[in-house]
Amino acid sequence: MTIMRKTHPLMKMVNHAFIDLPAPSNISGWWNFGSLLGVCLIIQILTGLFLSMHYTPDTMTAFSSVSHICRDVNYGWLIRYMHANGASLFFICLYLHIGRGIYYGSYMYKETWNIGIILLFLVMATAFMGYVLPWGQMSFWGATVITNLLSAIPYIGPSLVEWIWGGFSVDKATLNRFFAFHFILPFIIAAMAMVHLLFLHETGSNNPLGILSHSDKIPFHPYYSYKDLLGGVALLAFFFTIVLFFPDALGDPDNYTPANPLNTPPHIKPEWYFLFAYAILRSIPNKLGGVIALVLSILILALFPLLHTSNQRSLMFRPISQALFWLLVSDLLILTWIGGQPVEPPFIIIGQIASLLYFSIILLFLPIAGMIENKMLKW
């Protein structure tokens, strides 16, 4: 008798993706983040769904509806904090996942990598719009500042901003459409994640050595299914520690003040996971230049496959490139710190140097290091 999972049209798809999938025998814990991102997305969709049952996207009642969720709805406070901190967890996993991709040369699977970049943009857009919904001070002013950046686009800029706002300022129409987009985008992200997985399974997973593993494959289940399960348990333990003990550690106190268009907060800043890009934006003393640098800071990921000069795929045996990779990580941490600081000396110059270094490492130093390492292997 044939096994049902191998013949049933639906189960066959699941079987090929999660059960009988041939996987390299040596992939490490860094390969867990794909499944962890899936867990994060499910948490966000479920908590978001329950929040939307009680939330009202209206400037007059949005703030009080969030307050009502936290005070009056059964476990509303838990759902709200899970959703807010779930976003942070999502980005932690996302950045580690991208870092893994850069370190081990996974970007050489170009289709998978490019869909990953689109996914990153979608997740960033979703998170930004979600931050606007509680209609606190930082929600309102964050929305005003970030949407206003589009006015730097020549000719169509000002009209484009008013079109997005649905008026002459961030108001009821803006909040309403942001809620609509914030609700629909996670489902688009889920669909894109399926495409991401589809392209990955065309080639099979990369591995830490960056070499072909066709001769040494093991079935995904039970080996990696249990490994992913362990990762998920560890992730949830970390997640609930933050949610239950430090729920406001990653948020901004200004967002507990209702939005007031007549009172600007002293320091307008986005959530921590956007601070590196915000620092790059602010490091250029020109509006259009800053916006271009902001977009390029993420879009530069698309250049990784083109700038790969080494004969080896992974950084496993490339000490110069390894040093540059960790310099890049340190640089991003410095940019994150600078993004949360006021625009005054010495933070301005630190931000400018860190921004220049960020682009230099990716566009210049890493490709040169690859060529040097090729020469070293010949000697």
UniProtKB/Swiss-Prot annotation:
The chain crosses the membrane at residues 33-53, 77-98, 113-133, 178-198, 226-246, 288-308, 320-340, 347-367. Keywords: Electron transport, Heme, Iron, Membrane, Metal-binding, Mitochondrion, Mitochondrion inner membrane, Respiratory chain, Transmembrane, Transmembrane helix, Transport, Ubiquinone. SUPFAM superfamilies: a domain/subunit of cytochrome bc1 complex (Ubiquinol-cytochrome c reductase) (SSF81648), Transmembrane di-heme cytochromes (SSF81342). Gene3D superfamilies: Cytochrome Bc1 Complex, Chain C. One of its GO terms (cellular component) is respiratory chain complex III. It is a multi-pass membrane protein. Its cofactor is heme b. GO terms for molecular function: metal ion binding; ubiquinol-cytochrome-c reductase activity. It is found in: Mitochondrion inner membrane. Heme b b566 binds at H97, H196. Binds 2 heme b groups non-covalently. A ubiquinone binds at H201. Belongs to the cytochrome b family. Heme 1 (or BL or b562) is low-potential and absorbs at about 562 nm, and heme 2 (or BH or b566) is high-potential and absorbs at about 566 nm. Component of the ubiquinol-cytochrome c reductase complex (complex III or cytochrome b-c1 complex) that is part of the mitochondrial respiratory chain. The b-c1 complex mediates electron transfer from ubiquinol to cytochrome c. Contributes to the generation of a proton gradient across the mitochondrial membrane that is then used for ATP synthesis. PANTHER family: CYTOCHROME B. The cytochrome bc1 complex contains 11 subunits: 3 respiratory subunits (MT-CYB, CYC1 and UQCRFS1), 2 core proteins (UQCRC1 and UQCRC2) and 6 low-molecular weight proteins (UQCRH/QCR6, UQCRB/QCR7, UQCRQ/QCR8, UQCR10/QCR9, UQCR11/QCR10 and a cleavage product of UQCRFS1). This cytochrome bc1 complex then forms a dimer. This is Cytochrome b. It comes from Perognathus merriami. The gene is MT-CYB.
